Design a protein with these regions (language model features):
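Noncatalytic alpha-helical scaffold of FAD-dependent oxidoreductases
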Residues: 1-242
C-alpha cells in the first residue's frame, strides 16, 4: 500500500474495486479469494475480520462486504488471500475475422465444453468510430498471429501434454480445422492476455470506458441495441463487456 510507483495498482485497490481478470469465469472473482483483512475505518479504529484458513468465518463475513466497497468502509492495510498454483504452461487459440454472432457461439461452445478453458474474449474491428481508433494490429504485435482482422481468443492452461490434447479436441469440437486460425504458444499467450487484462485495446482512446456485466446470452443483443455506435469488446465469454 505504501511502496511502489503511484501509477501501478495495489492488492487493496483491486479488492476495493472487486476487479477480476480474464480467468474470472473459471476461478471465481476476487471476492471468492479474500480470507481476511485488517484495516482502519473512518473513526480511526483498527478493524480485523477473517483469518488465514479457508473455513474461518463465524458470523457476518466482512471480507466479502469490503470487496467492491471502493474504500468507503475501511482503508485496507493487510489482506489474506487464498491462492492457486500457477499453470505450468498455456496456449491460446485465435480464430480470425469472425463476426459477433459466430464469435459468441465459439466462446459459448468452448466454455461449455470439457476442455477446461481459462480465457474467452472477442476483439472486433467494427464499428469504425471517429475519435475512437482501436488498432488490433498495433495492440497485438505477435509473431504467431497469421493475419489481421477481428480476434476470437480462447485460452487453455495446464501441463504441456494436457494442453496439446485439449487444444486438438477444442479445434475438432468447434469444427474450425479449415478456418483461419493461429495458436499462441506460452510466452506470446501471456503477452496477449496481459494486454487484454490491461485494456490496451483502448489505449489510444480519449473517451470514457464503461464496464458492463451481463448474461453471456445477452451480449450480442446489447451490441445491436447500441446500434454499433460504440467501440467494444467482450470478455468472460460474453459476460463482461467494455
Amino acid at each position: 500500500m505504501f511502496s511502489g510507483k503511484s501509477d501501478y495498482g495495489t492488492a487493496a485497490g483491486q479488492v476495493a474495486c472487486n476487479i477480476s481478470g480474464p480467468r474470472r469465469f473459471k476461478v471465481g472473482s476476487i471476492r471468492d479469494h479474500v480470507l481476511g483483512f485488517r484495516g482502519v475505518n473512518g473513526r480511526g479504529e483498527i478493524i480485523k475480520s477473517g483469518g488465514v484458513v479457508v473455513k474461518n468465518v463465524t458470523g457476518y463475513d466482512l471480507s466479502k462486504l469490503i470487496c467492491g466497497s471502493y474504500g468507503t468502509l475501511v482503508a485496507l492495510t493487510e489482506i489474506t488471500f487464498k491462492v492457486l498454483p500457477a499453470p505450468e504452461t498455456s496456449k491460446t487459440l485465435i480464430i480470425h475475422n469472425q463476426k459477433i454472432e459466430p464469435a459468441a457461439y465459439f466462446l459459448d461452445k468452448s466454455i461449455s465444453s470439457s476442455n477446461d478453458i481459462s480465457g474467452a474474449v472477442f476483439l472486433p474491428t467494427e464499428p469504425k468510430i471517429a475519435g475512437c481508433v482501436m488498432n488490433i494490429e498495433n495492440t497485438f504485435k505477435l509473431n504467431d498471429l497469421k493475419q489481421d482482422g477481428s480476434l476470437t481468443a480462447i485460452r487453455i492452461e495446464g501441463s504441456k501434454e494436457s494442453i496439446d490434447q485439449r487444444m486438438k479436441n477444442l479445434i475438432n469440437e468447434l469444427k474450425i480445422v479449415n478456418q483461419n486460425i493461429s495458436i499462441l504458444e506460452t510466452h506470446q499467450s501471456e503477452i496477449f492476455w496481459n494486454k487484454v487484462k490491461n485494456l490496451e485495446f483502448f489505449s489510444s482512446s480519449k473517451n470514457s470506458i464503461l464496464r458492463i456485466v451481463i448474461p453471456p446470452s445477452e451480449c450480442v443483443k446489447l451490441v445491436y441495441q447500441l446500434s454499433h455506435k460504440y467501440k467494444y469488446y467482450f470478455d468472460w465469454g460474453g459476460a463482461l463487456m467494455w
